[in-house]
C-alpha cells in the first residue's frame, strides 16, 4: 500500500475571469495550504475500487476521485495496472477548503 496526503487550502483571493467554450471559467487564485489533510491509500486491485471512511461521501461516478480516475484511464489506455483507493476524510465536506479537488489531484 502507498499513502498520499491531500492538503486543504484557504483561498486568499479569487478572481473569476472569462467564460470558456466548455462552460467553465478561467480563474486567478491565490491560496495557502493549511495543516489539515485527508489521506489516500492506494493498493493494487483487479479493478478500480473507491472506499471512504465517511458514509456521507458518495463513492459513485460523481466523486471527483472517480472522475479523475476515468480521465486518466482514457488517456493512459496502455497502462494495465488497476488499484483501489481508500480515502480517510479529515477535511470538512463543503467547508470551502478544497478537499474534494485536492483528493482528485
Summary of predicted features, one role per range:
Residues 95-105:
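DPxDG-like acidic metal-binding loop motif
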Amino acid at each position: 500500500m502507498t499513502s498520499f496526503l491531500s492538503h486543504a487550502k484557504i483561498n486568499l483571493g479569487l478572481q473569476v475571469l472569462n467564460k470558456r467554450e466548455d462552460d467553465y471559467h478561467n480563474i486567478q487564485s491565490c491560496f495557502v495550504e493549511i495543516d489539515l489533510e485527508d489521506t489516500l491509500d492506494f493498493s493494487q486491485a483487479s479493478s478500480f475500487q473507491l472506499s471512504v471512511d465517511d458514509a456521507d461521501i458518495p463513492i459513485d461516478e460523481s466523486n471527483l476521485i472517480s472522475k479523475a480516475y476515468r480521465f486518466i484511464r482514457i488517456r493512459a489506455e496502455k497502462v494495465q495496472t488497476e488499484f483501489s483507493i481508500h480515502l480517510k476524510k479529515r477535511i470538512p465536506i463543503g467547508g470551502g477548503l478544497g478537499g474534494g479537488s485536492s483528493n482528485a489531484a
